[in-house]
Amino acid sequence: MSCSKGLSQSLKEDRISQLPDPLLTQILNLLPTEEAVKTSVLSTRWRTLWLWVPNLELSFSKFPCFNAFLSFGNLFFDSDRASCVESLKLYLDGNDASYLKPWVDALVKRKIQRLYVRRTLGGYSHVMPLSLYVCDSLVSLRLYRLSLVDAEFVSLPCLKILRLKDIVFHNETTFERLVSSCPVLEELKIDVVWNDGNVYKVHSRSLKRFCFRSSSLRFDESVPGVVVDAPLLCCLIIDDSVSESFVVTDLESNAKFDISLCFRLWRFDEAKRSIINMFLAWISRVRDMKICAHTFKLIHRYSESSPLPRFGYMSSLYVTLNASELEWFPIFLRSSPNLKSLILERSGSSHQLSRKAMERVSMSSVPECLLTSLEFVEFKAPICGLGPEMMLVWYFLKNSPTLKKLTLPLKSHSTKDDFFKKLLEIPRCSTECEIVIL
């Protein structure tokens, strides 16, 4: 009786083992890789189940030595295994990487969909094998600190997301061919942290989102530039302090841009003026734009000798300003007649705002957008209620009959009562404007 009871209890406790292998594999797939592998000691039934898990994260740092890492990988990346691999995150060290070719070859054969490979130690000698260039199942590819060789033939028919950081390209053609051979590519992100001398040419009929970041530790270093030809592009993020030029030849009229460019601002000659002229021409078609302080200063310098284009499409603007640029800001707004939403970020202390400069702003002619379209204004930097700051608040409340909401963050709650008194003294042009104090 007691034996029968014990057997019954044992069966109840091990009901999970009675589930079919495909269902057990799905359960293991919910666990971190190292936890899934631990189940191999439960019984003979469980010994190899983890090998069929479709999602894996493999890092050399989880193993006592390189040989243990290599043995584990060779066991999983068996090209004869019939199961598909949906996704893999692979973290490499600086050891010899000859194992990469058979591993990646096996992944391509097993229909990998999402691949992330990152080298965390060593230089850039780890070269991705040629089989990766012809993977017909790959949907997402993210590579970090690796080398890509030139391939005569590239075919990635399903790739939608491509992210490359600190990648060494054999030449400019390697990158250009890679991007242009992805017919359904929608998102591209590139991070460059040294001067590789390449012109990055992006030609894509399907690309919708593009992020490019480039920087250098050397003040005098520059790179040739970037050329983008992507007619469906609707979101562009640029954080580039080293490129001599950045050209976008085609884009959606409703595009959203986040721009941090300086074009080596300290060398402002005729050639640079021509580049900036082209830059302004293509951003004039943007609907939603975010501009950093360096880029705004660049536009200001250009306007001192050449007229600005009309930013007729722009309805939303997020701009960071130095105190010295604030006086010129209304002039920029005159080129944005249909602006509806404005977010102002201040670079530097509020004490740098000049009362005389703000007086000149308040006495300048009112831009068309303030009179006909501006509905939302938000100050991002906390304000103290100082004279020059209040003059800027006065400028929007006094001159915009269409304003619906003004958002002001206070630096100190102790000034709130005094700040309210100052606000009540400002005449409002709009009868519907709501003032929100944060």
Curated annotation (Swiss-Prot):
LRR repeat windows: 135-166, 167-192, 235-261, 318-346
InterPro entries linked: F-box-like_dom_sf, F-box_AtFBL13-like, F-box_dom, FBD, FBL13/AtMIF1-like, LRR_dom_sf, LRR_FXL15/At3g58940/PEG3-like
Sequence ranges assigned to domain FBD in this UniProt record: 362-409
Record's keyword terms, sorted: Leucine-rich repeat, Repeat
Annotated ranges, domain F-box: 13-59
Coiled coil: none
Gene3D superfamilies the record matches: 1.20.1280.50, Ribonuclease Inhibitor
Domain of life per record: Eukaryota
PROSITE patterns referenced in this protein's UniProt entry, alphabetically: FBOX (PS50181)
Annotated protein name in UniProt: Putative F-box/FBD/LRR-repeat protein At2g05300
Species in which this protein is naturally found: Arabidopsis thaliana
